[in-house]
Protein backbone atom coordinates (compact mmCIF):
# COMPACT_ATOMS: atom_id res chain seq x y z
CA UNK A 1 0.00 0.00 0.00
CA UNK A 2 1.43 3.38 -1.02
CA UNK A 3 1.51 5.91 1.81
CA UNK A 4 1.44 9.58 0.90
CA UNK A 5 -0.13 11.05 4.01
CA UNK A 6 1.05 11.39 7.56
CA UNK A 7 0.62 13.48 10.67
CA UNK A 8 2.74 14.55 13.59
CA UNK A 9 1.17 14.07 17.02
CA UNK A 10 2.45 16.15 19.91
CA UNK A 11 2.92 14.00 23.02
CA UNK A 12 4.42 14.36 26.48
CA UNK A 13 6.01 11.80 28.80
CA UNK A 14 2.56 10.52 29.80
CA UNK A 15 0.69 10.44 26.49
CA UNK A 16 3.57 8.78 24.65
CA UNK A 17 3.15 5.85 27.02
CA UNK A 18 -0.59 5.74 26.26
CA UNK A 19 0.28 5.16 22.61
CA UNK A 20 2.88 2.50 23.34
CA UNK A 21 0.71 0.59 25.78
CA UNK A 22 -2.65 0.78 24.01
CA UNK A 23 -1.87 1.49 20.33
CA UNK A 24 -4.29 4.40 20.41
CA UNK A 25 -3.52 8.03 19.61
CA UNK A 26 -5.28 10.41 21.99
CA UNK A 27 -6.07 14.07 21.29
CA UNK A 28 -6.91 16.33 24.20
CA UNK A 29 -9.99 18.57 24.12
CA UNK A 30 -10.79 21.45 26.48
CA UNK A 31 -13.95 21.35 28.56
CA UNK A 32 -16.88 22.98 26.69
CA UNK A 33 -17.13 25.98 28.98
CA UNK A 34 -16.55 28.98 26.69
CA UNK A 35 -18.92 30.51 24.16
CA UNK A 36 -17.07 29.06 21.15
CA UNK A 37 -16.66 25.48 22.37
CA UNK A 38 -18.33 24.17 19.19
CA UNK A 39 -15.65 25.89 17.10
CA UNK A 40 -12.95 24.08 19.10
CA UNK A 41 -14.68 20.73 18.61
CA UNK A 42 -15.00 21.36 14.85
CA UNK A 43 -11.33 22.36 14.74
CA UNK A 44 -10.21 19.08 16.30
CA UNK A 45 -12.66 17.11 14.14
CA UNK A 46 -11.20 18.69 10.99
CA UNK A 47 -7.72 17.46 11.94
CA UNK A 48 -9.00 14.01 12.90
CA UNK A 49 -10.91 13.56 9.64
CA UNK A 50 -7.75 14.26 7.63
CA UNK A 51 -6.33 10.98 8.92
CA UNK A 52 -6.94 7.90 6.80
CA UNK A 53 -6.42 4.18 7.28
CA UNK A 54 -2.92 3.28 6.12
CA UNK A 55 -1.50 6.74 6.76
CA UNK A 56 1.57 7.24 8.95
CA UNK A 57 1.76 8.86 12.38
CA UNK A 58 4.88 10.26 14.07
CA UNK A 59 5.15 11.25 17.73
CA UNK A 60 6.72 14.62 18.58
CA UNK A 61 7.63 14.48 22.27
CA UNK A 62 7.85 17.89 23.90
CA UNK A 63 10.95 19.10 25.70
CA UNK A 64 11.27 18.54 29.42
CA UNK A 65 13.96 19.32 31.99
CA UNK A 66 16.14 16.32 31.34
CA UNK A 67 15.73 15.89 27.59
CA UNK A 68 15.29 17.76 24.32
CA UNK A 69 12.26 17.48 22.05
CA UNK A 70 12.37 14.20 20.12
CA UNK A 71 10.54 12.50 17.27
CA UNK A 72 9.49 8.85 17.34
CA UNK A 73 8.14 6.71 14.54
CA UNK A 74 6.49 5.19 12.78
CA UNK A 75 2.91 4.20 13.50
CA UNK A 76 0.24 3.31 10.96
CA UNK A 77 -3.41 4.34 11.29
CA UNK A 78 -5.74 1.31 11.28
CA UNK A 79 -9.14 2.79 12.12
CA UNK A 80 -11.35 5.75 11.46
CA UNK A 81 -11.23 8.51 14.09
CA UNK A 82 -13.73 8.30 16.93
CA UNK A 83 -14.85 9.98 20.16
CA UNK A 84 -14.99 8.20 23.50
CA UNK A 85 -15.22 9.42 27.08
CA UNK A 86 -15.83 6.09 28.80
CA UNK A 87 -12.38 5.59 30.28
CA UNK A 88 -9.86 7.12 32.66
CA UNK A 89 -8.65 9.46 29.89
CA UNK A 90 -11.77 11.60 29.50
CA UNK A 91 -9.66 14.70 28.77
CA UNK A 92 -8.52 12.92 25.57
CA UNK A 93 -11.81 11.94 23.90
CA UNK A 94 -10.67 12.12 20.25
CA UNK A 95 -8.95 8.87 19.37
CA UNK A 96 -7.72 6.64 16.59
CA UNK A 97 -6.27 3.10 16.55
CA UNK A 98 -2.71 2.60 15.30
CA UNK A 99 -0.10 -0.13 14.91
CA UNK A 100 3.64 -0.04 14.32
CA UNK A 101 4.65 0.35 10.69
CA UNK A 102 8.36 0.66 11.44
CA UNK A 103 9.80 -0.52 14.73
CA UNK A 104 12.47 2.07 15.52
CA UNK A 105 13.91 1.82 19.03
CA UNK A 106 15.74 5.15 18.93
CA UNK A 107 14.13 8.54 18.27
CA UNK A 108 15.69 11.49 16.47
CA UNK A 109 16.17 14.90 18.06
CA UNK A 110 14.00 17.73 16.84
CA UNK A 111 17.17 19.78 16.28
CA UNK A 112 18.56 17.16 13.88
CA UNK A 113 15.44 17.44 11.76
CA UNK A 114 14.77 21.17 11.71
CA UNK A 115 18.41 22.15 11.24
CA UNK A 116 19.44 19.51 8.72
CA UNK A 117 20.84 21.52 5.75
CA UNK A 118 19.96 18.77 3.26
CA UNK A 119 16.24 18.64 4.01
CA UNK A 120 15.37 21.99 5.60
CA UNK A 121 13.49 23.21 2.52
CA UNK A 122 11.32 20.09 2.56
CA UNK A 123 10.24 20.40 6.19
CA UNK A 124 7.86 23.32 5.65
CA UNK A 125 4.91 22.13 7.74
CA UNK A 126 7.09 21.18 10.73
CA UNK A 127 9.05 24.42 10.58
CA UNK A 128 5.80 26.36 10.24
CA UNK A 129 4.32 24.69 13.31
CA UNK A 130 7.48 25.30 15.34
CA UNK A 131 7.57 28.99 14.44
CA UNK A 132 3.86 29.52 14.99
CA UNK A 133 4.07 27.93 18.43
CA UNK A 134 0.33 27.27 18.47
CA UNK A 135 -1.10 24.62 20.84
CA UNK A 136 -2.18 22.16 18.18
CA UNK A 137 -2.20 18.49 19.18
CA UNK A 138 -1.62 17.19 15.67
CA UNK A 139 -0.29 18.70 12.47
CA UNK A 140 -0.12 17.39 8.89
CA UNK A 141 3.20 16.57 7.30
CA UNK A 142 4.00 16.54 3.61
CA UNK A 143 5.04 13.60 1.46
CA UNK A 144 8.64 14.84 1.43
CA UNK A 145 8.65 15.19 5.21
CA UNK A 146 7.47 11.59 5.63
CA UNK A 147 10.34 10.34 3.45
CA UNK A 148 12.91 12.51 5.21
CA UNK A 149 11.83 11.47 8.70
CA UNK A 150 11.91 7.77 7.86
CA UNK A 151 15.37 8.07 6.29
CA UNK A 152 16.69 9.85 9.40
CA UNK A 153 15.11 7.26 11.70
CA UNK A 154 16.62 4.42 9.65
CA UNK A 155 20.03 6.05 10.04
CA UNK A 156 19.60 5.96 13.84
CA UNK A 157 18.34 2.39 13.89
CA UNK A 158 20.38 -0.20 12.03
CA UNK A 159 18.25 -3.10 13.20
CA UNK A 160 14.84 -1.61 12.53
CA UNK A 161 11.88 -3.73 11.52
CA UNK A 162 9.24 -2.91 8.89
CA UNK A 163 5.76 -4.37 9.36
CA UNK A 164 3.77 -4.48 6.08
CA UNK A 165 0.18 -3.26 6.02
CA UNK A 166 -2.51 -5.92 6.28
CA UNK A 167 -6.14 -4.83 6.01
CA UNK A 168 -7.14 -7.78 8.22
CA UNK A 169 -5.79 -5.75 11.15
CA UNK A 170 -8.09 -2.78 10.47
CA UNK A 171 -10.25 -2.03 13.50
CA UNK A 172 -13.89 -1.09 13.06
CA UNK A 173 -15.19 1.59 15.41
CA UNK A 174 -18.79 1.86 16.46
CA UNK A 175 -19.39 5.55 15.75
CA UNK A 176 -16.70 7.13 13.52
CA UNK A 177 -16.60 10.92 13.49
CA UNK A 178 -18.83 12.68 10.98
CA UNK A 179 -21.02 15.73 10.50
CA UNK A 180 -24.72 15.10 9.92
CA UNK A 181 -25.95 17.77 7.48
CA UNK A 182 -29.56 17.22 8.52
CA UNK A 183 -28.91 18.41 12.07
CA UNK A 184 -29.52 22.17 12.16
CA UNK A 185 -31.29 22.83 15.46
CA UNK A 186 -29.99 24.29 18.71
CA UNK A 187 -27.10 22.54 20.39
CA UNK A 188 -27.45 21.36 23.98
CA UNK A 189 -25.95 23.30 26.86
CA UNK A 190 -23.12 21.14 28.14
CA UNK A 191 -20.53 21.37 30.87
CA UNK A 192 -18.41 18.28 30.32
CA UNK A 193 -16.91 16.44 27.36
CA UNK A 194 -18.95 13.39 28.35
CA UNK A 195 -22.23 15.33 27.95
CA UNK A 196 -22.25 15.05 24.15
CA UNK A 197 -20.96 13.22 21.09
CA UNK A 198 -19.64 15.38 18.19
CA UNK A 199 -21.75 13.43 15.67
CA UNK A 200 -24.93 14.54 17.43
CA UNK A 201 -24.19 18.27 17.29
CA UNK A 202 -25.46 20.84 14.81
CA UNK A 203 -22.77 22.57 12.74
CA UNK A 204 -25.11 24.41 10.34
CA UNK A 205 -27.59 27.22 10.98
CA UNK A 206 -31.18 26.06 10.87
CA UNK A 207 -32.67 28.29 8.15
CA UNK A 208 -29.70 29.05 5.90
CA UNK A 209 -27.67 25.82 6.25
CA UNK A 210 -24.58 28.03 6.38
CA UNK A 211 -21.76 26.85 8.65
CA UNK A 212 -21.69 28.27 12.17
CA UNK A 213 -17.92 28.79 11.95
CA UNK A 214 -15.52 29.00 9.02
CA UNK A 215 -13.48 26.15 10.51
CA UNK A 216 -16.44 23.81 9.89
CA UNK A 217 -15.82 24.07 6.14
CA UNK A 218 -12.42 22.44 6.74
CA UNK A 219 -14.16 19.66 8.65
CA UNK A 220 -16.68 19.12 5.85
CA UNK A 221 -14.05 19.05 3.09
CA UNK A 222 -11.96 16.51 5.02
CA UNK A 223 -15.04 14.41 5.67
CA UNK A 224 -16.03 14.33 2.01
CA UNK A 225 -12.46 13.75 0.82
CA UNK A 226 -12.03 10.83 3.22
CA UNK A 227 -15.11 9.35 1.50
CA UNK A 228 -13.62 10.23 -1.91
CA UNK A 229 -16.90 11.95 -2.76
CA UNK A 230 -16.43 12.19 -6.52
CA UNK A 231 -19.62 14.17 -7.20
CA UNK A 232 -18.81 16.80 -4.57
CA UNK A 233 -15.22 17.50 -5.62
CA UNK A 234 -15.83 17.27 -9.35
CA UNK A 235 -17.76 20.54 -9.00
CA UNK A 236 -14.49 22.39 -8.34
CA UNK A 237 -12.44 20.41 -10.86
CA UNK A 238 -10.86 17.86 -8.51
CA UNK A 239 -10.52 14.25 -9.65
CA UNK A 240 -10.58 12.29 -6.37
CA UNK A 241 -9.11 9.24 -8.10
CA UNK A 242 -5.91 11.21 -8.70
CA UNK A 243 -5.66 12.83 -5.26
CA UNK A 244 -2.48 11.78 -3.46
CA UNK A 245 -2.50 14.31 -0.60
CA UNK A 246 -4.87 16.75 1.04
CA UNK A 247 -4.98 18.70 4.25
CA UNK A 248 -6.50 21.62 6.09
CA UNK A 249 -4.80 24.40 8.06
CA UNK A 250 -1.30 24.45 6.61
CA UNK A 251 1.46 26.92 7.52
CA UNK A 252 2.26 29.58 4.93
CA UNK A 253 6.02 29.92 4.49
CA UNK A 254 7.61 31.01 7.79
CA UNK A 255 4.94 33.57 8.53
CA UNK A 256 2.42 32.98 11.29
CA UNK A 257 -0.54 32.48 8.99
CA UNK A 258 -2.25 29.41 7.60
CA UNK A 259 -3.64 28.20 4.30
CA UNK A 260 -7.12 26.77 4.76
CA UNK A 261 -6.94 23.80 2.39
CA UNK A 262 -4.64 22.18 -0.18
CA UNK A 263 -5.34 19.25 -2.51
CA UNK A 264 -2.61 17.63 -4.64
CA UNK A 265 -3.40 15.54 -7.72
CA UNK A 266 -0.93 13.35 -9.60
CA UNK A 267 -0.73 11.14 -12.64
CA UNK A 268 -0.11 7.51 -11.65
CA UNK A 269 0.50 8.60 -8.03
CA UNK A 270 3.85 10.14 -8.92
CA UNK A 271 3.79 13.15 -11.23
CA UNK A 272 1.93 16.11 -9.74
CA UNK A 273 -0.35 17.63 -12.36
CA UNK A 274 -2.62 19.93 -10.33
CA UNK A 275 -2.67 21.61 -6.94
CA UNK A 276 -5.77 23.29 -5.54
CA UNK A 277 -5.44 26.07 -2.97
CA UNK A 278 -8.79 26.67 -1.28
CA UNK A 279 -9.66 29.57 1.00
CA UNK A 280 -12.86 29.30 3.01
CA UNK A 281 -14.95 32.27 4.04
CA UNK A 282 -18.08 32.86 6.04
CA UNK A 283 -20.32 35.52 4.57
CA UNK A 284 -19.48 37.37 1.38
CA UNK A 285 -16.15 37.38 -0.43
CA UNK A 286 -13.83 40.16 0.68
CA UNK A 287 -10.57 41.62 -0.60
CA UNK A 288 -8.38 40.07 2.12
CA UNK A 289 -9.43 36.55 1.14
CA UNK A 290 -8.82 37.30 -2.54
CA UNK A 291 -5.31 38.55 -1.80
CA UNK A 292 -4.53 35.59 0.40
CA UNK A 293 -5.75 33.10 -2.20
CA UNK A 294 -3.40 34.56 -4.80
CA UNK A 295 -0.51 34.97 -2.34
CA UNK A 296 -0.73 31.39 -1.10
CA UNK A 297 -1.10 29.93 -4.60
CA UNK A 298 2.03 31.81 -5.73
CA UNK A 299 4.00 30.40 -2.80
CA UNK A 300 2.84 26.85 -3.57
CA UNK A 301 3.85 27.33 -7.22
CA UNK A 302 7.32 28.42 -6.11
CA UNK A 303 7.79 25.48 -3.74
CA UNK A 304 5.73 22.37 -4.43
CA UNK A 305 5.20 23.42 -8.06
CA UNK A 306 8.91 24.03 -8.86
CA UNK A 307 8.16 27.51 -10.20
CA UNK A 308 5.32 26.49 -12.51
CA UNK A 309 1.74 27.81 -12.56
CA UNK A 310 0.26 24.53 -11.40
CA UNK A 311 -1.88 25.84 -8.54
CA UNK A 312 -5.54 26.76 -8.96
CA UNK A 313 -6.70 29.36 -6.39
CA UNK A 314 -10.28 28.88 -5.17
CA UNK A 315 -12.54 30.60 -2.64
CA UNK A 316 -15.54 28.78 -1.17
CA UNK A 317 -17.97 31.12 0.56
CA UNK A 318 -21.60 31.79 1.41
CA UNK A 319 -22.27 34.64 -1.00
CA UNK A 320 -20.78 36.30 -4.04
CA UNK A 321 -22.35 39.28 -5.77
CA UNK A 322 -21.62 39.32 -9.50
CA UNK A 323 -20.60 42.77 -10.63
CA UNK A 324 -22.87 44.22 -13.30
CA UNK A 325 -22.12 47.61 -14.78
CA UNK A 326 -25.73 48.27 -15.72
CA UNK A 327 -27.01 47.93 -12.14
CA UNK A 328 -26.27 49.79 -8.95
CA UNK A 329 -24.23 47.68 -6.54
CA UNK A 330 -22.56 48.30 -3.24
CA UNK A 331 -19.23 50.13 -3.34
CA UNK A 332 -17.45 47.18 -1.74
CA UNK A 333 -18.58 44.91 -4.59
CA UNK A 334 -17.20 47.38 -7.14
CA UNK A 335 -13.91 47.46 -5.25
CA UNK A 336 -13.74 43.65 -5.14
CA UNK A 337 -14.30 43.47 -8.89
CA UNK A 338 -11.56 46.04 -9.49
CA UNK A 339 -9.12 44.05 -7.35
CA UNK A 340 -9.91 40.85 -9.26
CA UNK A 341 -9.38 42.60 -12.59
CA UNK A 342 -5.97 43.90 -11.46
CA UNK A 343 -4.82 40.48 -10.25
CA UNK A 344 -5.92 38.79 -13.46
CA UNK A 345 -3.65 41.03 -15.51
CA UNK A 346 -0.66 39.25 -13.93
CA UNK A 347 -1.88 35.81 -12.85
CA UNK A 348 -2.10 32.91 -15.30
CA UNK A 349 -4.40 30.91 -13.03
CA UNK A 350 -7.56 32.94 -12.45
CA UNK A 351 -9.30 32.79 -9.10
CA UNK A 352 -12.47 30.71 -9.06
CA UNK A 353 -15.22 31.54 -6.55
CA UNK A 354 -17.86 29.05 -5.41
CA UNK A 355 -20.81 29.29 -3.07
CA UNK A 356 -22.01 26.27 -1.15
CA UNK A 357 -25.41 24.79 -0.36
CA UNK A 358 -25.48 21.96 2.17
CA UNK A 359 -29.28 21.83 2.39
CA UNK A 360 -29.46 19.61 -0.69
CA UNK A 361 -28.25 16.15 -1.66
CA UNK A 362 -25.77 15.85 -3.26
CA UNK A 363 -23.99 18.76 -1.58
CA UNK A 364 -23.77 21.70 -3.95
CA UNK A 365 -20.80 23.88 -4.86
CA UNK A 366 -21.92 26.50 -7.37
CA UNK A 367 -19.37 28.27 -9.54
CA UNK A 368 -19.93 32.03 -9.53
CA UNK A 369 -16.80 33.18 -11.26
Where are these regions (language model features)?
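Charged, terminal alpha-helix-loop-beta segments
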Residues: 1-34, 49-52, 99-104, 127-369
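Aromatic- and Lys/Arg-enriched surface recognition patch
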Residues: 68-72, 76-143
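Active-site catalytic microenvironments for nucleophilic, acid-base chemistry
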Residues: 60, 80, 299-303
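Short, solvent-exposed secondary-structure capping/transition elements
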Residues: 66-70, 83-87, 271-272, 305-309
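TIR-domain catalytic/interaction hotspot
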Residues: 37-50
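Short coil-to-beta transition motif at edge beta-strands of beta-rich domains
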Residues: 47-63
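Aromatic- and glycine-enriched beta-alpha-beta binding-site module
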Residues: 58-59, 73, 269-270
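Catalytic micro-motifs at enzyme active sites that drive phosphoryl/nucleotidyl and oxygen chemistry
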Residues: 61-64, 82-88, 135, 249-251, ...
Amino acid sequence: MEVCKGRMFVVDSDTINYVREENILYIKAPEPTNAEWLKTIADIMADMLQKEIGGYAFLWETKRNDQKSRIYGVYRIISKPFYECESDKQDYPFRIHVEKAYDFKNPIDEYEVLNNPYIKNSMWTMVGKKIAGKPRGTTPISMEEIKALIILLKDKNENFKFIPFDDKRIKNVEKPLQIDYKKTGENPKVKNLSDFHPNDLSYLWENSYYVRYEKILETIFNQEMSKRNEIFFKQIGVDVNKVIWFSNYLPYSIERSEMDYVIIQAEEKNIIDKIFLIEFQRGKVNINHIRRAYMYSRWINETLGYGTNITKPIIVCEKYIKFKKDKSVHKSDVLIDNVLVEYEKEEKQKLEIYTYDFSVTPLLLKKCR
